[in-house]
Amino acid sequence: MRFISIFLIIVALCVSSSWAFNFTDQPNSFRISGTGCGSGTTTVYFSTDGRCNSACGGSIRIKGEGNNVPNQQFTLNDYSKNVTNCSGTSNVASFRCPALVNTTSPTFTVNVGNSAYHVTCQYAQVTETPAGNSADKVAVGIAIIFGALISLLAL
């Protein structure tokens, strides 16, 4: 009986730590791609300092607007070295999200200059940790872990 109790406590520890700290998260990166210069929604959008093709030679700013997105701006300087074609017909880039952005959201339509792109990236909520987990979720997970450890010592 004691062995079963210890086994169940260890299982609870593993499950709660995985749930609290989300060990199975994918890397916080994404890809954007598109063709030509089109249009799209601006709930979350990328903008450049000039026309559509200026992204090839410069940096990109990611800026969030709307009710659910903080009005903050980040500069992603590594975009230009990942562009495969600067003619505006087939620009593809991959880069890491800023610290306050995670990849758990649905795909948004965004603009890079005047080009329409899709990206799987969103701003994290204020209460989220850099890993994208809420502070409450992490606190509850830690409490479960400590409770299980105390139970192990009591056996």
Swiss-Prot record:
**Propeptide intervals in chain numbering:** 134-155
**Record's signal peptide:** 1-20
Membrane topology term: Lipid-anchor; GPI-anchor
Q: Which species?
A: Dictyostelium discoideum (Social amoeba)
Q: Where are the transmembrane segments?
A: none
Name the residues where the record annotates lipidation as GPI-like-anchor amidated asparagine.
Answer: 133
Coiled coil stretches, renumbered: none
- On the tree of life, the source organism's domain of life is Eukaryota
Q: Which residues are glycosylated?
A: 22, 82, 85, 102, 105
> Which keywords accompany this UniProt record?
Cell membrane, Glycoprotein, GPI-anchor, Lipoprotein, Membrane, Signal
Return the protein name: Prespore-specific protein E
- Provide the Gene Ontology terms for cellular component: cell surface; plasma membrane; side of membrane
PTM (free text) = The GPI-like-anchor contains a phosphoceramide group, rather than a phosphatidyl group.
Tell me where it resides: Cell membrane
